[in-house]
Structures are given as structure tokens and as C-alpha cells.
Design a protein with these regions (language model features):
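Ligand-recognition surfaces built from glycine- and aromatic
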Residues: 42, 108, 201-233
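Short strand-turn-strand beta-turns centered on an Asx-Gly dipeptide
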Residues: 190-194
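Extracellular glycan-recognition surfaces and repeat-rich motifs
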Residues: 53-79
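Short tryptophan-centered beta-strand motifs in secreted/extracellular beta-sheet-rich domains
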Residues: 170-180, 187-189
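N-terminal module-boundary/linker segments of secreted carbohydrate-active enzymes
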Residues: 35-61
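Short, aromatic/His-centered strand-loop micro-motif at the edge of beta-sheets
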Residues: 154-173
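N-terminal export signals
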Residues: 7-26
Length: 233
């Protein structure tokens, strides 16, 4: 992916629910209030928490401590638009990212973490699924979630579908569940355990998760992560 380039993708399917209509009679109201609503299913039900490993990608000419800190269970990662890429001579945008080393081709895989996006982070990807081995001419990513400096902090799929507003300066949980197959698989995105997006992936590939800041904008970008987990089934 070239510098200052973000792949676009079509709109996804947003989760929704049917409206519930109740009778206004006292008997019907009593019956309705007597039965509690069933709790929403946890997206990790039926999944197994699995260990994972990762390596770091950061500006090639800097120490990791110049762009990352870890304290109290929280990873802080930041980068500047003027920083060097992760490899000398590389043409991609600057980043400070965890590159997960649990590559996969098929099967069900879920990335899970609490995310905090400080105000002002604009144009940075904070989590993505990178297609490292893929058919020629196919996209480099299956999905990317980006932060933009609008609406109190807007999270978009690439630079298109709006998934969340008022995302700045607050913790929220993100889960990306990928049902990968030898053909076209399915990706589901959850915020605070509510489904916000369902889309197809980009077809067969070997891929891996990444999280941090991959900066396509200007100035400084930062993201924080805690309770990072990997699930399979």
C-alpha cells in the first residue's frame, strides 16, 4: 500500500432489531413485564481463547520506546506523519503496530481488545487484517478500522462506512470475527458486544491481525489498547 493511500470498500450491513409492540391492556402489560428479556449473546460464546504472539513494526530509525509505552496493562502507541516507514526504503505510511504472528488461511478467528482513541487522531488505522499472501491484483487488506477527527471522533471502515461517533477519549471494546474459507469468507465487527458491521472478506489469502496506529493523515496519531485477546473456534 503506497503512502497516503487507503483502500475503499463498499458499505456493510448494520445490525438492527425488530420493534416490539405491546398491548395497552393491564393484563397484557402485566404479562409482558413478568417475562424478562433474554440477554444478548456474547460474541465469544462457542469460541476458545487462544494464545498469540506478535512482533513490532515502528519507524525503522527509532527505538520502540520512542513510539510505545506499556503501563498498568495498557499499550500506548503513537506516530507522527513525518516519521519514517517501518523499513528503510519502504514507501508505506508511518506506523507503530503489533504485527500478530498467528497467520491463518481458513477457520474462525477473532481479534478482541478495549480501544482508546485520544482526541485529534485523524486518518489513522487502529486495527486491520492484512492479506500477506494473496492472488495477484487482489486488495492488501480484508478490513481496516480508521479514526477521523469529526463527530467527536468517528470510526469508519476504511474511509467509508461510519461505525461509531463520539469515539474520542473513551474506552470501548472492539471485536473483529473473521470466518475465513477457501472462497469468500465473512467478517463481523462488534463494538461493546453489539454487531455493527457484517461484510465479505476479499477472497482467499493468508492473513494476520495488526493493531496500533498506521497513519494516513497529518500530525500525531495515537491509539491505546488493553485486554487484548485472540479467540478461535
Amino acid at each position: 500500500m503506497k503512502r497516503r493511500t487507503v483502500l475503499r470498500a463498499g458499505a456493510g450491513v448494520l445490525a438492527g432489531g425488530a420493534a416490539l409492540t405491546l398491548s395497552h391492556s393491564p393484563l397484557a402489560a402485566a404479562a409482558a413485564t413478568a417475562v424478562p428479556a433474554a440477554p444478548a449473546a456474547d460474541p465469544t460464546d462457542g469460541w476458545t481463547r487462544t494464545s498469540f504472539t506478535y512482533s513490532w513494526q515502528k519507524p525503522w530509525n527509532l527505538d520502540l520506546s520512542d513510539r510505545h509505552s506499556y503501563s498498568g496493562g495498557v499499550h500506548r502507541m503513537w506516530v507522527y506523519s513525518t516519521d519514517e516507514p517501518f523499513e528503510e526504503g519502504n514507501s508505506t505510511d508511518p506506523r507503530t503496530e503489533m504485527r500478530w504472528k498467528n497467520d491463518y488461511t481458513t477457520g474462525d478467528h477473532m481479534w478482541d481488545a478495549d480501544v482508546y482513541l485520544p482526541a485529534g487522531t485523524d486518518g489513522a488505522s487502529f486495527v486491520q487484517t492484512l492479506r500477506t499472501r494473496r492472488p495477484s491484483g487482489t486488495p492488501a487488506t480484508d478490513i481496516m478500522l480508521n479514526a477521523y477527527n469529526t463527530g467527536g471522533g468517528t470510526v469508519r471502515r476504511y474511509d467509508g462506512t461510519v461505525l461509531k461517533t463520539n469515539a474520542y477519549d473513551t474506552w470501548f471494546n472492539v471485536k473483529i470475527a473473521h470466518e475465513a474459507s477457501s472462497g469468500t469468507g465473512t467478517i463481523k465487527v462488534y463494538f461493546d458486544d453489539s454487531l455493527v458491521l457484517t461484510v465479505d472478506d476479499r477472497g482467499p489469502a493468508t492473513r494476520y491481525f495488526k493493531n496500533g496506529v498506521y497513519h494516513h493523515g497529518s500530525g500525531r496519531a495515537e491509539a491505546r489498547f488493553r485486554n487484548i485477546a485472540y479467540w478461535t473456534r
